[in-house]
Amino acid sequence: MLGVQKKCSTRKTAARKTVVRKPAAKKTAAKKAPVRKVAAKKTVARKTVAKKTVAARKPVAKKATAKKAPVRKVAAKKTVARKTVAKKTVAARKPVAKKATAKKAPVRKAVAKKTVARKTVAKKTVAARKPVAKRVASTKKSSIAVKAGVCMKKHKHTAACGRVAASGVKVCASAAKRKTNPNRSRTAHSWRQQLMKLVAR
């Protein structure tokens, strides 16, 4: 076989005797040709069948049957005498005279008007308002702040207004001032800061 290496003969294999095989002598058997037997044919005598003469059929004479036309009986018409019905003369209806009913005009009752005497209300003389003298805000805010008990900002005094100035006036902290400023625009950052303060409390 290709690709298979031959084994190197070892000492054991070399010691063995190599047996030489003799080819067996083939016997040539003489083939006998098969002998075919010819079958003897039997001659069968055929009988001739006598043909029967069939008598010719005579055509049957057709009877001409006279067809009778169906006779229609004419029904005798009965003459019915019509009676003339006397017409009834309907009396002409007289038009019914309509009664002219005099329509009564609804009489309206005139309600007597009550004359209500109006009382003349005496006009109250309103005293002329005197112009209120404007209070001149003094430069010293300390006296007003101490009297009012409210800090100088436009809101109620809270704990945030704890810082007291040297003059004795309570001044709001920056947080309290910014909350009330109308011009202040709120941003997302300020909202977040305020929420954080509320949560911390």
Curated annotation (Swiss-Prot):
Gene that encodes it: hctB
TM stretches of this protein: none
Basic residues: compositionally biased ranges: 8-50, 59-69
Highest taxon, organism lineage: Bacteria
Stretches the record annotates as Disordered: 1-69
Molecular function as annotated in GO: DNA binding; structural constituent of chromatin
Family: Belongs to the histone H1/H5 family. HCT subfamily.
Gene source species: Chlamydia trachomatis serovar D (strain ATCC VR-885 / DSM 19411 / UW-3/Cx)
Matching Pfam families: HC2
Keyword DNA-binding applies: yes
One GO BP: chromosome condensation
The keyword DNA-binding belongs to this UniProt entry's keyword annotation: yes
Function in brief: Might have a role in establishing the nucleoid structure of elementary bodies.
Entry keywords, A to Z: DNA-binding
Protein name: Histone-like protein HC2
InterPro entries to which the protein is assigned, alphabetical: HC2
